[in-house]
Every structure is written in structure tokens, then in C-alpha cells.
């Protein structure tokens, strides 16, 4: 099976701080470097959690945090898969950016989800039911074909089309996530430019002082230990793209904002924003 992106990292990377090369099908290999930033290590320690922040600039990938081995460990993508779900759905004309997904009055996990919304609004609210509906429209066969075509993570979706990204079997490493989102940021994924532009517009989180921050959160609550994500990119004032994937162990009592707090502090520490 051809993968659009795959990576191989030797264990010594996390022990010695050396650099290695990993292969991207149809791409120039990226250089992976263990970052040396004790302050970011301490940020994760202070939150009593284990985590890694993967940063990609051009073809160089740097790893920061207090659990760098997580960078090449597979985890369920949780709601970060909404990015690919939207790309597949729009590309295959299963929806469009103007469609209103109707709420039928059923109880949902969060009251913020209990309303009609577009795909873009559902992306910002991380409304699982809307993206489950989209996945069902796409269907198991087409979804499997598309996930394999893109080579996202292990590309395994199992037999249930509306929860494989929440509980498995789909899994992806933080390095693979940062590669995926970097290609999206540069409009280099094998989808139409229009579809990629539409999805990128859904992901804008913040804009200030000439910087734009795009991203998607994820929180896998139904697995043990729980996993948190925040994956996206910074568009700097000069147009340069810096992609990131934050991955950490979560606990039920943690505030959802902890991921954004860790990310923003780390990006400032690295002078990315």
C-alpha cells in the first residue's frame, strides 16, 4: 500500500539528540532533530503530564517537550481527523461549505452542539455528530479508499465508518500529523486547491500582529490513557509556514484549554509568534 507520507525514526533519536532521515513517498526526506529547550520541557512537567510538541519548518522537524518518544508513537487522531474528513467529503461532493446540518432535537454531549450548523461551524465547535453524519454519507468503502490514498497514519478504519478516528483502529503519530498539516498549509495534498482552501478557512483560530494561527484540537476520551491533540500551523507575517502537532496525555479533570495554553507558551518561547 502506497502512503503519501510515512516516517521512520530510530530509538537513538530520543536518547542521544542525533539527527536522522525519514522517508516521505514522493517527497524529499525531512530531517528530524531533538530540540533542546528545557523551558518547554518544564511547561509539560508543570501540568503534570507527558507530551511532545513537533514543529516542522520547510523540511526540518524539531521535537520539544518532556516525552519525545511520543513523536513516533501511534495514537487515535480523535477530532484532528475532522480535517481529512472534511477534505474527503468536499472533494467527493458529499456536502458543500454552505449546507446546514440540521439538529433534530436529540441530546448531544455538549449544549453548544445542539443547533443547526455548517461544516465550518461544526469544525470550530468540534461537533462530532456533524462529522459522523458526513462520514456515513462518504461510506465505508470510499472512506477506506481515500484514507489509504492519502496514507494517513496506519490507514486502518475497520468496519464502522463513524467512530474509527475516536476509538480506533485508525492511529497516527505526531510526526505524521505535522507532515499532513504542513502539506495542507502549503496546499500540497492530493485534493483540489479549492477544497483545501475551504478547509483551511475553517481552521483559523487566531489572527493578530500579522500572524495567523490555524489548527484543530482533538481529545480521545474513550481510551486509556486519554490523548490530547492540537495540530495546525502558523502563517507568519512574511508568509512563512511553521506547522505544529502537540500531543499529550490527558485526564478527565483537565481543562480543554490546557492544550492551547501549552502550545501558545511554547510557540512564544521558540519565537515562532
From Swiss-Prot:
Keywords assigned by UniProt, alphabetized: Antibiotic resistance, Hydrolase, Periplasm, Plasmid, Signal
Assembly, per entry: Monomer.
Record keyword DNA repair present: no
Main function: Class D beta-lactamase which confers resistance to the beta-lactam antibiotics, including ampicillin, and carbapenems such as imipenem and meropenem. Acts via hydrolysis of the beta-lactam ring. Has penicillin-, cephalosporin- and carbapenem-hydrolyzing activities, but lacks ceftazidime-hydrolyzing activity.
Enzyme superclass (EC): hydrolase
Family: Belongs to the class-D beta-lactamase family.
The protein's name in its UniProt record: Beta-lactamase OXA-23
Cellular component annotations (GO), alphabetically ordered: periplasmic space; plasma membrane
